[in-house]
Amino acid sequence: MHVEGDSMMPTLHNDDIVLIDVGRRSPTPPGIFVLHDGMGLVAKRLEHIPNSDPPAVRVISDNPLYPAYERTADEIRIIGRIRWFAREI
């Protein structure tokens, strides 16, 4: 998958290629995941929110210009954990 946009900079840049481990969908431990947020596929850092009812995650962009937000497990679909990326030099 190609990354689109600058919300995950400086970690991931626009047009980086990411390899997704679709067998790793649990946001524990925290990490960078590809998820479907109802509008499309996005790469974001996810953190499980302990003791949340219903279960929820904090969705975080590495770029500080984009604020973090929270979503319940029903509001997103985690595709998998990003394990590798490549960038053209």
Segments from the language model and where they lie:
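Acidic/glycine-rich C-terminal interaction modules and beta/coil loop segments
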Residues: 1-89
